[in-house]
């Protein structure tokens, strides 16, 4: 792994809990840079992100066994640690405080920067709603930013800038992390309008700096309605397939798509700015997709990948045929590579190929 230097920008003293009212009225309308962490690297080529989805650590989990499995997942892509680890929601469900602390002690001990997004189950444990945030912020290698009392809904809305070291540094990629929230009545919640406005504010900040065309990936837990649209229009509701004739989309759908309670303008806003290359989610444990979806049917370079990543581990329901870790390797060409590694508990990891994925579904199309 190439040397990485971590810089955290703009956490202000008035954001701490318990600050006096003289700091200003709430909610706080903070500048874009207060949500940005920067990783400085020597070379963008081969910067690899390992994503864990839906660990579902609970009081029933044997954390010793599961940590051994997570270790196996981390090095499943060629035997080396990744450049960044992303925990993309539902790491916990019904866990104890001691398990949360032990898990983050372990992941911080790897010496790899790690990002965290909240899923709909993470706060369902025998601990306060602030515990996960507090434990993560105490970790040396965490990149989570969560300003308190701001005007952006949720607890994990922030940006990771990937900069190549030079004179001056060059911003190569941005990684966006969103709290896709929990529930709206009996349904799942959505990305709120103020979160969409926050994204627009971040994009405007890039324009103000004279760097408007920075590629990005988006990580969040709950999918948007576009995942279902892509399944219908590209996949024709067939369980698995590889659309080699047109979009190059690849998918296996083991369950229905559990998106939020209403449609939003989140995807459309991203497509308008033309910088975001993918929305990467978890949530539905036995779906694995790379939809190449262009909702406005414009130019090919305005397509957004809609990616269900692999579920990690055997916490609650799972399919051992598609379980392990997802790896995304950034390129200097504004593109990225995807590698899905199936990681059995007792056998050697192997890469999930298009042929393997197609073969999992009945009536698959190639």
For each predicted feature, which ranges?
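Extended active-site neighborhood of metal-dependent phosphoesterases/phosphodiesterases
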Residues: 30-32, 99-211, 306, 326-331
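N-terminal active-site segment of His-dependent metallophosphoesterases
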Residues: 22-102
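Binuclear metal-dependent phosphoesterase catalytic core
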Residues: 26-30, 36-37, 159-163, 266-268, ...
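C-terminal motif of bacterial Sec signal peptides marking the signal peptidase cleavage site
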Residues: 15-18
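His/acidic metal-ligating clusters that form di-metal
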Residues: 78-83, 174, 188-288
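Acidic/histidine-rich helix-loop elements
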Residues: 50-68, 92-98, 125, 130, ...
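Beta-strand-turn-beta hairpins that frame and shape the catalytic cleft
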Residues: 37-50, 155-177, 214, 292-306
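Active-site environment of divalent metal-dependent phosphoester hydrolases
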Residues: 58-60, 92-96, 116-127, 183-186, ...
């Amino acid at each position: 792994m190439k040397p990485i230097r971590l810089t955290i920008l703009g956490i202000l003293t008035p954001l701490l809990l318990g600050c006096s009212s003289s700091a200003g009225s709430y909610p706080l309308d903070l500048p874009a840079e207060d949500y940005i962490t920067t990783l400085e690297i020597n070379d963008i080529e081969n910067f690899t992100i390992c994503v864990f989805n839906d660990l579902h650590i609970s009081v029933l989990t044997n954390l010793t066994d599961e940590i051994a499995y997570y270790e196996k997942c981390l090095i499943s892509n060629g035997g080396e640690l990744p450049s960044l680890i992303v925990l993309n929601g539902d790491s916990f469900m019904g866990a104890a405080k001691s398990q949360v602390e032990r898990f983050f002690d372990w992941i911080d001990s790897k010496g790899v920067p790690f990002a965290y997004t909240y899923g709909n189950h993470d706060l369902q444990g025998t601990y306060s709603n602030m515990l996960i945030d507090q434990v993560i912020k105490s970790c040396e290698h965490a990149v989570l930013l969560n300003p308190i009392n701001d005007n952006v809904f949720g607890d994990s809305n922030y940006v990771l800038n990937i900069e190549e070291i030079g004179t001056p540094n060059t911003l190569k990629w941005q990684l966006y992390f969103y709290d896709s929230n929990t529930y709206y009545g009996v349904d799942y919640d959505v990305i709120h309008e103020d979160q969409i406005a926050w994204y627009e504010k971040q994009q405007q900040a890039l324009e103000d700096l004279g760097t408007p065309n920075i590629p990005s990936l988006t990580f969040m837990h709950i999918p948007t309605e576009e995942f279902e649209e892509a399944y219908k229009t590209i996949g024709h509701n067939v369980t698995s397939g590889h659309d080699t004739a047109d979009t190059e989309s690849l998918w296996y759908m083991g369950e229905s798509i559990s998106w939020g309670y209403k449609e939003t303008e989140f995807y459309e806003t991203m497509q308008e700015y033309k910088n975001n290359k993918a929305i990467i989610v978890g949530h539905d444990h036995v779906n694995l997709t790379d939809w190449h979806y262009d909702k406005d049917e414009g130019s090919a370079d305005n397509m957004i990948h809609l990616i269900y990543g692999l579920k990690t581990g055997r916490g609650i329901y799972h399919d051992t045929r598609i379980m392990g870790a997802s790896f995304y390797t950034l390129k200097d060409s504004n593109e990225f590579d995807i590698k899905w590694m199936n990681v059995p508990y007792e056998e050697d990891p192997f890469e999930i190929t298009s042929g393997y994925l197609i073969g999992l579904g009945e009536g698959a199309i190639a």
